[in-house]
Swiss-Prot record:
UniProt subunit comment: Component of the eukaryotic translation initiation factor 3 (eIF-3) complex. The eIF-3 complex interacts with pix.
Record keywords, A-Z: Cytoplasm, Golgi apparatus, Initiation factor, Protein biosynthesis
Annotated gene: Tango7
Name of the featured protein: Eukaryotic translation initiation factor 3 subunit M
Family the entry assigns: Belongs to the eIF-3 subunit M family.
GO biological process: formation of cytoplasmic translation initiation complex
Annotated PCI domain residues: 181-340
Keyword Protein biosynthesis: yes
Main location as per UniProt: cytoplasm
Annotated Gene Ontology cellular component terms: eukaryotic 43S preinitiation complex; eukaryotic 48S preinitiation complex; eukaryotic translation initiation factor 3 complex, eIF3m; Golgi apparatus
Keyword Transcription: no
Function: Component of the eukaryotic translation initiation factor 3 (eIF-3) complex, which is involved in protein synthesis of a specialized repertoire of mRNAs and, together with other initiation factors, stimulates binding of mRNA and methionyl-tRNAi to the 40S ribosome. The eIF-3 complex specifically targets and initiates translation of a subset of mRNAs involved in cell proliferation.
Pfam families, A to Z: eIF3m_C_helix, PCI
Amino acid sequence: MASHPVFIDLSLDEQVQELRKFFKKLGAEISSEKSNKGVEDDLHKIIGVCEVCFKDGEPAQIDGILNSIVSIMITIPLDRGENIVLAYCEKMTKAPNQPLAKVCLQSLWRLFNNLDTASPLRYHVYYHLVQVAKQCDQVLEVFTGVDQLKSQFANCPPSSEQMQKLYRLLHDVTKDTNLELSSKVMIELLGTYTADNACVAREDAMKCIVTALADPNTFLLDPLLSLKPVRFLEGDLIHDLLSIFVSDKLPSYVQFYEDHKEFVNSQGLNHDQNMKKMRLLTFMQLAESYPEMSFDTLTKELQINDDEVEPFVIEVLKTKLVRARLDQANRKVHISSTMHRTFGAPQWEQLRDLLQAWKENLSSVREGLTNVSSAQLDLARTQKLIH
């Protein structure tokens, strides 16, 4: 989101005086006279009544008023500005409609970007602007990913507790519109826990698992099992379900659903979507072992009809998780490569062997080129002596 620098031509005293008069004229319970306690008290009074401009004002006019308030706020020293900033942030979350919420979002973004990057107040402003962004469907304008988020606070990292609170909020505001991003946020959240406090993260761990399972674009689920809060769920149904999605095939999920249908539904998971995902994961697992699969094998393993095989394979190829070729004439699928569902010691060993083979092949090529080069030099010398 673009942000413009804050600057007002009037002096602080003149700005305060004008703001007091403006809100007094709108009917707010505020004196038009400056406080003898200083500009900070003036700001407290002004912020306390600033929502009255939401009633009848035009968005452009309101934006100008809020801009003036922000221009005064950023002059307050850090040690005396926390309560003022927090009070202002709370007011900005009270916008009565979407157009005004956008104005409030712009104001908070302006405040965020004009605070010193080392100011701990930036965290509080950002938390509230995410709340406001949700109100006006602008979340992706202020949050595009975890890396971007961390860079925002590079000069003043929030505490683990603050980041946990922020990650939970970001999960809530993205889960209905961007499951992939929401899933990444939850994984980051679980990563903030240590062995000492992972046991208290049960609810967060369950949300993380459910979000990852529900995300149609998340297929590599194995890393979740290594997260400490997830380990504490071992023996619970949600952990059993995750384990099925990590390494089991479709029949295991079907059996689990038959035994625990109420549990799956209570987690907000869609059975049809689960079946679709498990079919794809099962296909990937089969592709790891079989470079060639018949249509009959796929109808049996994936529990689909014969006429559904080709459309299914085409959908799999669109994900780019598997490279394959359909052979309609012989009713077969030829596999070129596939992403592994799990990546453990066997896969690392396989990768090591592959790289070692490449290294040996490159050495052979280099040796061959050296021999060719030497032969050409010898030939050139011989021809030179003859002439």
